[in-house]
Amino acid sequence: MLKKAKWKDDCLSPILLGIDDLCDGYFKKDYEKIFPFFDAGYGTSNDGSIFRYLNKNLLQKYPEIKITFFLPFGKGAYWDKEKSIINDIFERDEFEKFLNFVLDCDYEIAYHGHDHGLVNSTIDPNTWCCEFDQYSKEEYFEIIKSDLAKFKDKFGYEVCGGRSPGYKFKDDLIDGLCECGFKWWSFDYKPFINNINLKYNGYNIIEMPSNLSGDMFNYGKNPIKSAAKYFLNLYRLEHMIKGGQAVSIAEHFFRTRFDGKIQMPNIYNDINSLDFLFGYLRNKDIWYATFSECANYYESYNNTDISDMGDGVFEIKYKGSWKMFLTFISEYRYLENIQTKEIYEGFMKNNRWLFNDLVEGIYRGHQNVF
């Protein structure tokens, strides 16, 4: 027997954490000291920064967490330049070092637009001018291609996916995302819905989910309503995990909005909710993944075929466009690649042998060393 595991290491479900709006910005220009509730990334990992706050209160406690940071690559157009500090991500050496540190931690950087769009002083969603409405289609995607090329040149890193600010996008622009080389995109927030698909509206780009809010376990003023919300959200979360769904937690790096209101969800306000959530998940049979890791696995699972040729011989064929990234399950401890003569040894989980490093080819199963 040789078959595919639905998720890596035959885990029940992948857990993703996507954090929007990391940028080289700080809300109060006249403040000499950095405070986490005014920081969007300008403080890098220094004392008082929002990243230091996140690291101290969550990441050190749960080092298994994988994060995909969604970054606007240019200067945020909605920032008040008179009162705030805002740079594009390529301007400051200290921020460049910080992004290299983020990548060295095996976190992911994804695209979150160029300037995040324009907005009026009240941040009325009805008056939001999306990036793609500021330019022609050709101009818009030339900006994106330039951002991606510059990032790859500077960091040696290829950005695989992204998410539009506010999840706003037009279907007639999706072909442009494909032309830019994006393999996946997070198109919409759908609470407790497993919105992961191999193609989005027929386009060759993977739809990645966003389905949990990081503030889901924050307590409100009404204890009865808070308790009801708590148990309902736990039930929904359990249902997703047991159903093998991709769980994708949505958060924001920046707390303060420019109309004086608080942006929700946000890391600063939601730290206790996130602490409870990841504490609850710790004993679950789950896989912590970045968006690209999850997308790659999902693509591999749906594009890999196994043929049973009899007598313990199996053929693996992959017809996808990425490198195959897949866990296989077998009754055999050893699998011999008949073509290359290489022997792979599995690892035991739930009384079955698992393999993470198989490639395309024909394999013969063996129970013992030979």
Task: Please give the residue ranges for each predicted region.
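Active-site beta->alpha N-cap acidic-glycine motif
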Residues: 1-105, 157, 163
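Conserved, mostly hydrophobic/aromatic
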Residues: 20, 112, 162, 177, ...
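A solvent-exposed, charged loop/short amphipathic helix patch at secondary-structure junctions
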Residues: 25-44, 124-135, 260-264, 269-275
